[in-house]
Amino acid sequence: MFCMETTTIAGVKVSRIGLGTWAIGGLDWGAVPDDVAVATCLNALERGINLIDTAPIYGHGHAEEIVGRALRAHGRREDFFIATKFGLDWNERGVFANSTTARLRQELEASLRRLGTETIDLYQVHWPDTRTPIAETAAQLAEFQRQGKVRALGVSNFSIAQMEEFRAVAPLSSNQPPYNLFERQIDDQREHGQSILSWCAVNNVAILTWSTLCRSLLGGRVHRGMSFDKGDIRRVDPKFREPRFSEYMTAVERLAAFARERYGKSVLELAVRWVLDRHGVSVALWGAKRPDQLDAVSGVISWQLDDAAMAEIDRIVKESVTDPVGPEYLAPKVREG
């Protein structure tokens, strides 16, 4: 039996691997039976994963309902660290950022109801809303914290400037950006000479990475010529369109060979270990919608990549992918009105 690596967020001990529930919501990744989704959450806890990350947008509330069912089935709320989000609205025209005070109050009560809990451990702004002052949003969150409805506050997809503005009003415990072998914007982009990753490390802001496996591209099951069902989010991901798809698959194949020959590991295990070994990363979120998709968790724990391996990984990615693209296509629309 392996021993899960842990860290702390706002003084609470959490697993360094967190369960991501985007796929469990049933939209964007294909349907999953509710009993299987609940079993996935419970199986994660059995493997030492106590942090579950969810959001109202995941299945339009369904993922939160699944997590709530898992909490009730387990019976001990304190065994879980529940992170959810707010700040997105949707209609027939698409998904919009909306962090107004009215929307925030509405979303908090809805999330508490769906999760069946009195308190959310980590409440995160899902995306920046350029039409609502960050200070206004942060002030309302601080009020929720004083009321005991929220324990810790976080953001997702925020720049350094936006995080600075937020924490001038309320305590900031975490940031959740996209980060994986192929998407390194928090490493590469600089604000006043500093990366988001280094800023968070210096300012004691925990990093929880989403898309750790780059929409399953690094999961070991995607292959050349693969097609995706209608409604699958990868159908609109530019990484999965030629000629980029072939370049990314070349990188995956070379990384898989490197992982196997150097460590006896899979490309999935290599990809998650790479994220965990980056300075400043607290938690790598691992998306799963079936218990068996967590089988590889044990292969990620209790080993590390050395500097030579990190350099070789960088070389493989740089040589293989000549026209990289990030996850910008996932950003919500600017709210009307």
Language-model segments: which ranges?
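Structural preference for beta-strand elements that scaffold enzyme active sites
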Residues: 14-18, 50-51, 79-85, 119-122, ...
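Active-site mouth loops of central-metabolism enzymes
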Residues: 23-35, 90-105
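Structural motif corresponding to the early beta-alpha repeats
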Residues: 74-98, 126
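Active-site groove signature of glycoside hydrolases
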Residues: 112-133
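Beta/alpha (TIM)-barrel catalytic core signal, keyed to glycine-rich beta->alpha loops juxtaposed to Asp/Glu
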Residues: 128-315, 336-337
